[in-house]
């Protein structure tokens, strides 16, 4: 079974993130869910991003790297939105990563100074009308990553919600999340083959 390091989004470590992690654990996987906000949580994306700007994006990624340094290198890095920054940087630059899962976000691989490891499997999930994912360049970065990697998939779901797989938020889409979880669990299962 896979070991997963899962980073939360800009609203913090919500109950919905824990629920998602529990779904992966139900598939037999080990899931680590660190709190990169050190106990802070927010009711809006804007408030969460204001906190991130206050402490700095680099600090968020560094907190993720510190957690990763205490875990095995052979791990799947996963992130929701803001958490994709730490997950993508670690997956792209740390040796022996097993895979990557990006939810609602993707950044250009050039941001981390190296190409995506061609044989590192990755899935990217987002809604096809999510203004954050579609209008802020994430979908283009996702298409570029998929084109450059040997084992990469981009899954688009109908809808305009950003945090659609967080069951504790009003943006939750149960149908899209069920399909996302099915795809993620299959991805993790295939890593063991």
Features from the language model and the residues they span:
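A conserved short beta-strand
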Residues: 96-106
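Conserved alpha/beta-hydrolase "acid-adjacent" motif
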Residues: 131-138
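Gly/Ala-rich beta-loop-alpha elbow adjacent to hydrolase catalytic centers
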Residues: 79-83, 87
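Serine-hydrolase catalytic machinery in alpha/beta-hydrolase-like enzymes
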Residues: 2-72, 164-165
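Short beta-strand/loop motif that positions the catalytic acidic residue
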Residues: 124-126, 157
